[in-house]
């Protein structure tokens, strides 16, 4: 009888191909019998991680449904303020259990800690089996049917899998290191193992049924944009955003109200204003936050957009918007300087004026892109100077039609520099959006396109912010001109204008 062959892969393309191959699955659980609901053997045999085919799809759906009830921002909130003296693994599980509203999170964390090592293949002994039984009794008291037990098994599996990997991320991201940098430079999961459920072929290599595959994520990751620590479809980790929010919360990194809007599990629609009245009117309509449009600011002054000519006007607008009871982010073009220190100073002025976020673009007025290292230096300088300001790093690869294939690579550098979100105007095709969200660690912002997907579909594709850019300003100009022309030509005037008193009421009233 021949023994299984072990295949090792360390090149990025090979590892990604292996992760994406449905024939390669995590090593199946050791075929040891264990009582249902009361043993590690039962747990391993009941979770999505070690299943394939229909069982994997069914169990993965249970995990996805569990996570769908929980916005990443809620995970961050539950993890914030945790006792930093306890073991990182305990803190991770306690925070996630609390966010999922499980009873006695502290006890859940202790029991999961006792299960974790045995779950991943080490001998946990009878103590680990007893911990499984206690968890089942705590999380699903009285449940004995197969369907109910499978559901609770996958709840426990979710906690166990978060235990080690997220704790490693927390430890590696200490001292202010962006988690995006850790995931690419020092991934918490450095090696993954797979078993061939059936014969397949990866990177020109024949893999027989039963062969073992070892994937060196640490080596493969170097120099590549998309982090591999969360796997790839069809087994991509469904809790990536939750794990990152959990880590940030445990690290004590605050999530501002504006940042929280990007971590709600859906797309934030951010309309763009050009003066106080337009911003206040949008806020009065119920929009949770507004952005500014650099075109609207520049055009209102008779200046070209993107020419770094509106620095002081932008700061003045921020000062006016800061008087209002709404969150706002400022479009600051490229920071109005190629000196990172000057950009950081501008960011501080905007923050002190009341801005919750800043948009920094790498496109230049001459139609070229700024060097990626320069733009990253601006981002890093701003985050160091004003940690509480949400930095939305924009790349104009699609907008200017310059090397769109390098988009993910540029954004990876910006994420590593500390960007809180990334913006790709001009990207509107569904496949491109889905591929990019899979490569990112931070929330993706796109520009709304009337010909592209709607807000709900963009959210389903993984987009977390949708900007309207200059659309509203251009619509307002068109409306003003068409109304004047209709009156001149004796035609009908379109109704719907705001009453004079309503516009007056938008003013903050403090001079």
Q: Which stretches of residues belong to each language-model region?
A:
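Cytochrome P450 heme-thiolate monooxygenase catalytic core
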Residues: 58, 71-168
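Alpha/beta enzyme core
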Residues: 256-328, 336-446, 450-468, 475-477
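Active-site substrate-recognition loop segments, prototypically the cytochrome P450 B′-helix/B-C loop
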Residues: 1-86, 93-103, 237
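Cytochrome P450 catalytic-core helices
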Residues: 153-179, 238-254
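Conserved cytochrome P450 K-helix E-x-x-R motif and the immediately C-terminal K′/meander segment
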Residues: 140-146, 176-219
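Cytochrome P450 heme-binding Cys-pocket and its upstream "meander" loop
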Residues: 216-245
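Extended, intrinsically disordered, low-complexity segments
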Residues: 258, 470-511
């Amino acid at each position: 009888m021949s023994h299984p062959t072990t295949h090792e892969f360390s090149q990025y393309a090979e590892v990604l191909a292996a992760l994406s191959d449905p024939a390669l699955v995590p090593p199946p659980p050791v075929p040891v019998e264990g009582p249902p609901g009361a043993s590690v053997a039962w747990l391993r045999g009941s979770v999505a991680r070690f299943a394939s085919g229909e069982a994997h799809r069914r169990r993965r759906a249970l995990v996805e449904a569990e996570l769908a009830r929980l916005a990443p921002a809620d995970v961050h909130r539950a993890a914030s303020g945790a006792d930093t003296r306890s073991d990182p693994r305990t803190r991770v599980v306690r925070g996630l259990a609390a966010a999922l509203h499980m009873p006695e999170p502290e006890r859940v964390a202790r029991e999961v800690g006792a299960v974790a090592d045995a779950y991943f293949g080490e001998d946990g002994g009878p103590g680990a089996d007893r911990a499984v039984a206690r968890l089942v009794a705590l999380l699903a008291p009285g449940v004995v049917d197969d369907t109910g037990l499978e559901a609770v098994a996958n709840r426990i599996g979710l906690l166990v899998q978060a235990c080690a990997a997220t704790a490693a991320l927390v430890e590696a991201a200490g001292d202010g290191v962006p988690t995006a940098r850790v995931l690419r430079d020092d991934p918490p999961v450095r090696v993954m193992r797979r078993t061939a459920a059936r014969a397949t072929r990866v990177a020109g290599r024949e893999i027989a049924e039963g062969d073992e595959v070892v994937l060196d994520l640490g080596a493969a990751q170097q120099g590549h944009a998309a982090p591999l620590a969360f796997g790839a479809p069809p087994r991509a980790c469904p809790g990536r955003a939750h794990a990152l929010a959990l880590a940030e919360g445990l690290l004590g990194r605050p999530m501002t109200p504006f940042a929280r809007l990007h971590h709600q599990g859906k797309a934030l629609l951010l309309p763009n204003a050009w003066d106080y009245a337009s911003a206040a009117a949008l806020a009065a309509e119920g929009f949770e936050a507004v952005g500014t449009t650099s075109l609207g600011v520049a055009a209102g002054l008779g200046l070209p957009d993107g020419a770094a000519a509106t620095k002081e006007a932008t700061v003045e607008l921020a000062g006016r918007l800061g008087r209002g009871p709404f969150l706002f982010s400022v479009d600051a073009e490229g920071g109005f300087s190629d000196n990172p220190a000057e950009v950081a100073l501008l960011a501080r002025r905007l923050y002190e004026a009341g801005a919750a976020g800043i948009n920094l673009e790498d496109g230049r007025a001459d139609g070229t892109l700024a060097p990626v290292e320069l733009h990253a230096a601006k981002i890093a300088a701003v985050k160091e100077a004003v940690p509480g300001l949400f930095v939305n790093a924009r790349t104009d690869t699609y907008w200017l039609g310059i090397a769109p294939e390098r988009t993910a690579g540029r954004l990876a550098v910006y994420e590593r520099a500390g960007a809180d979100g990334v913006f790709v105007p001009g990207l509107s095709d569904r496949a491109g959006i889905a591929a990019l969200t899979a490569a990112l660690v931070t929330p993706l912002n796109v520009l709304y396109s009337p010909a592209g997907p709607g807000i709900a579909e963009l959210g389903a594709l993984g987009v977390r912010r949708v900007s309207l850019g200059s659309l509203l300003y251009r619509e307002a100009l068109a409306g003003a001109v068409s109304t004047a022309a209709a009156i001149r030509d004796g035609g009908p005037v379109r109704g719907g204008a705001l009453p004079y008193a309503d516009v007056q009421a938008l003013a903050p009233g403090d001079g």
